[in-house]
Design a protein with these regions (language model features):
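P-loop NTP-binding site
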Residues: 74, 84, 105, 109-138
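A general boundary/transition motif marking the beginning of the first structured unit of a protein
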Residues: 55, 98-102, 122
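Residue-identity detector for threonine
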Residues: 7, 19, 89, 99, ...
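Short alpha-helix boundary/capping motifs
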Residues: 65, 94-96, 114
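Conserved catalytic-core segment of NTP-binding enzymes
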Residues: 1-81, 86-87
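Arginine residue identity/basic-tract feature
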Residues: 27, 38, 50-52, 91, ...
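C-terminal boundary of histidine-terminating zinc-finger modules
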Residues: 91-105
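Secondary-structure transition/capping residues
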Residues: 26, 78, 96, 118-125
Length: 138
């Protein structure tokens, strides 16, 4: 951990740890949480970024419960992997302003939670393929 991290942490009232639902990223987040604990920071919150519901459903990506079990800090938001983030970035527009973007809505919800509002977590559904729907018929 670099001195810049320690300097930033010293002045922080709140720490937002952002990770992705991958084992290596969660391990890194756990190390950061350990450093924050050693710095006597108590207000540590988690954001899980780039969630892919289809991969979670197949067991190829950690789900929020798995991540919470490992990190044991309060999760304040989950952000889906959303192609509209790339589109918005390429147009120079903030994705949070795009009301059709799942990620934009997730960012808005995180902001509202940070301001003290009680906002339910979004549920992300996987898109069923034609063959998945066909299988259900038989």
């Amino acid at each position: 951990i670099e001195q810049g991290f320690k300097t930033a942490v010293a002045a922080a009232d709140i720490a937002l740890v952002v990770t992705m639902p991958e084992i290596s990223a969660v391990r890194d987040a756990d190390k950061i949480i350990g450093e924050l604990n050693r710095a006597d920071k108590e207000n540590i919150l988690l954001i899980v970024n780039r969630i892919r519901p289809d991969m979670v459903a197949k067991g190829e990506m950690l789900d929020l419960d798995d991540i919470n079990d490992i990190l044991a800090i309060k999760c304040i938001g989950q952000i889906p992997d959303d192609e509209m983030v790339v589109s918005s970035t390429n147009r120079g527009e903030p994705v949070i302003a795009n009301t059709k973007s799942q990620a934009g809505i997730a960012y808005q919800n995180i902001t509202r939670r940070l301001c003290g509002e009680d906002v339910p977590f979004m549920t992300f559904r996987t898109k069923e393929s034609f063959f998945d729907r066909l299988k259900k018929l038989f």
